[in-house]
Amino acid sequence: MPDKGLFDIHCHIVPSVDDGASSAEEAYKMLQMEYRQGVRNIIATPHYRLQMFETPLETVEHQFLILKQLAQKVAPDLHIYLGCEFHSNMEMVEMLRNGEVHTMAGSRYVLTEFSGSTKASYIRERLYSLLSHGFKPIVAHIERYECLRKDIGFVEELADL
């Protein structure tokens, strides 16, 4: 990955696959805004959540190719990578191992999120499961989880993983 410019590693910009960019036109405008703000590298992270955001992988990948073409129209030094914001579930590791969802730019990093009321024990178990299978979790929206807002010690534990 190039090391020039800012990185946006959590962006719902792939058109027509989740609650982010609703069209290629909107995605193009978002790319222009990102570029004007100094962003040169974007990891597009469409949602994956059972029974809510289950866009077929082929559709996500097709729309991502459209996004890459749009990025080149904005500027040749705007680099786009595919990732995923994965709402944690018990099948997560298996889905990642089977390539049913994307890691962050093909790395071992996984952007994962939880419901706001998720218990600390479940968050801990899911993160340790990822780690024990060679994945490196990035917890999205840390401010949303009640158990983390109430327990700074748990936040520190997660930071030390």
Per-range role (PLM):
Residues 1-77, 156:
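An N-terminally biased module of ancient metal coordination in phosphate/nucleic-acid-related enzymes
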